[in-house]
UniProtKB/Swiss-Prot annotation:
Keywords: Cytoplasm, Methyltransferase, rRNA processing, S-adenosyl-L-methionine, Transferase. The gene is rsmH. It comes from Streptococcus agalactiae serotype III (strain NEM316). This is Ribosomal RNA small subunit methyltransferase H. One of its GO terms (cellular component) is cytoplasm. It is found in: Cytoplasm.
């Protein structure tokens, strides 16, 4: 593995094992990242099995070509450089209309966070960027410097759930009227200066939620996840499974809701039984999310907020 793309995979065995791998099946890793899940999944496949791996970051794909070389050489893995919201169209273009399982590791990968110039981290000084796909035009700089006060408040509340959203948006408006806000450090200081002394004493970095909100907005993370997970459930063969790792309450709430909608049915009044065409297409494999073990939590700080939800196609 290349040194500049080091990544400790979260819930590695749980995520893949819960897919109940069929050696000759067709599988998808919707979030290739450091290729940890892909590597373990490929190790479970026989010569007739195949993995399709998505990532919109070329660096991740370049790294995976090296890490997964033996599977590349046997033709068992196909890399797709695109946002996973285009899951269905990419697979259908490759002649794939049905899959046996798919896994998601949502959020930003550790290498992206650690790469200073990507501008994801409030801990390192860097240009405001936060794009997972470097080819897209919208950046964190654009959000911070061009969004109206009301739009900033909206995304800070909606995606950051920060109770100081109005104060932070107002302060951003004041500062950018003098000169553009161009670095992560500048933004982090503005956020800190907008919060009360009592709030600043709380555990965790005061800029964390706002940086999360801007990152979600720049990459339309929740919209992409919503579209992709729905497509994934439609692509699953009967008995196929979907595993989703989330890292914050918004992702987890979305996943839980999508799984609930697909695994329950509103029975019209007066119907003595549920007709076949109204039966749910999915069932929950685990009602409560699977959490990392104590051993994993001690070994990998990033695992602390991780939750794994799994569902199975039943018709």
């Amino acid at each position: 593995m290349t040194n500049d793309f080091h990544h400790i995979t979260v819930l590695l065995h749980e995520t893949v094992d819960m897919l109940d791998i069929k050696p000759d099946g067709i599988y998808v890793d919707a979030t290739l990242g450091g290729a940890g899940h892909s590597e373990y999944l490929l190790s479970q496949l026989g010569p007739d099995g195949h993995l399709y791996a998505f990532d919109q970051d070329q660096k991740a794909i370049d790294n995976a070509h090296i890490r997964l070389k033996k599977y590349v050489d046997t033709g068992q893995v196909t890399f797709i450089k695109d946002n996973f919201r285009n899951l269905s169209s990419n697979l259908k273009a490759l002649g794939v209309s049905e899959i046996n399982g798919i896994c998601y590791d949502l959020g930003v990968s550790s290498p992206q966070l650690d790469e200073r110039e990507r501008g994801f981290s409030y801990k390192q000084d860097a240009p405001l960027d936060m794009r997972m796909n470097r080819e897209q035009s919208l950046t964190a700089y654009d959000v911070v410097n061009t969004y109206s006060y009301h739009d900033l408040v909206r995304i800070f509340f909606k995606y950051g759930e920060d109770k100081f959203s109005k104060q932070i948006a107002r302060k951003i408006e004041q500062v950018r009227a003098e000169k553009p806000i161009s670095t992560t450090t500048e933004l982090a200081e503005i956020i800190k200066s907008s919060k009360s002394a009592k709030e600043l004493k709380k555990k965790g970095h005061p800029a964390k939620q706002i940086f999360q909100a801007i990152r979600i907005e720049v990459n339309d993370e929740l919209g992409a996840a919503d579209e992709s997970i729905q497509q994934a459930m439609d692509l699953l063969a009967v008995d196929g499974r979907i595993s989703v790792i989330t890292f914050h309450s918004l992702e987890d709430r979305l996943t839980k809701q999508l799984f609930k909608e697909a695994s329950t049915v509103e029975v019209p009044k007066g119907l003595p039984f549920i007709p076949d065409d109204l039966q749910p297409k999915m069932e929950l494999v685990n009602r409560k999310p699977i959490l990392p073990s104590q051993e994993e939590l001690e070994a990998n700080n990033r695992a602390h907020s991780a939750k794994l939800r799994v569902a199975r196609r039943i018709r």
